[in-house]
């Protein structure tokens, strides 16, 4: 199988199933964390098989917002986006709004993606977007995560919402 087939046909469905089992209290936090760690290793191995000599399509920056330590979704999106030829500046998880702004000034990405898994961190996402909007020449901002929707993205003044990794690739293909 090709790396993208492994990601789309095996890893993403397995992570989705682990999340569902966790929500049903059939899988517990240690097992969920083990799934996350295993998937990170698998993604790292698969990343080695992507064409590194392909022309770069653009530079994007991604972060999981302050207060949120769940970055599995962001990491999946990152690997898929990189596999399509984009360079991703990954700021990590639990990233303060001010740090996202500083990174924007330093790296000048063509788009910024923000992720949140918990409703309690949505105010952090809103603050991050508000501070980014104060920057001259701000690039498009997209948001994603289990607790987000198209409506909420509009409410917090994000330019775009993406539901999954392939939707993110489709968006980047359109806007960059």
What is each model feature region?
Residues 1-176:
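Domain-level signal for soluble alpha/beta catalytic cores
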């Amino acid at each position: 199988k090709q790396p993208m087939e492994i990601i789309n046909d095996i890893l993403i469905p397995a992570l989705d199933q682990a999340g569902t089992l966790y929500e049903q209290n059939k899988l517990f936090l240690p097992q969920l964390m083990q799934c996350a760690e295993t998937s990170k290793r698998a993604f790292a191995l698969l990343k080695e098989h992507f064409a590194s000599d392909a022309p770069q399509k653009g530079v994007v920056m991604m972060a999981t917002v302050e207060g949120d330590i769940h970055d599995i979704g962001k990491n999946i999106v990152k690997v898929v986006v990189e596999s399509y030829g984009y360079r991703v500046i990954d700021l990590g998880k639990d990233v303060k709004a001010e740090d996202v702004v500083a990174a924007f000034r330093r790296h000048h990405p063509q788009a910024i993606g923000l992720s949140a898994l918990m409703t309690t961190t949505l105010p952090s996402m809103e603050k991050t977007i508000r501070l980014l909007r104060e920057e001259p020449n701000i690039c498009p901002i997209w948001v994603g995560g289990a607790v987000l929707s198209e409506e909420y993205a509009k409410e917090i003044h994000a330019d775009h919402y993406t539901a999954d990794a392939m939707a993110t690739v489709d968006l980047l293909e359109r806007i960059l």
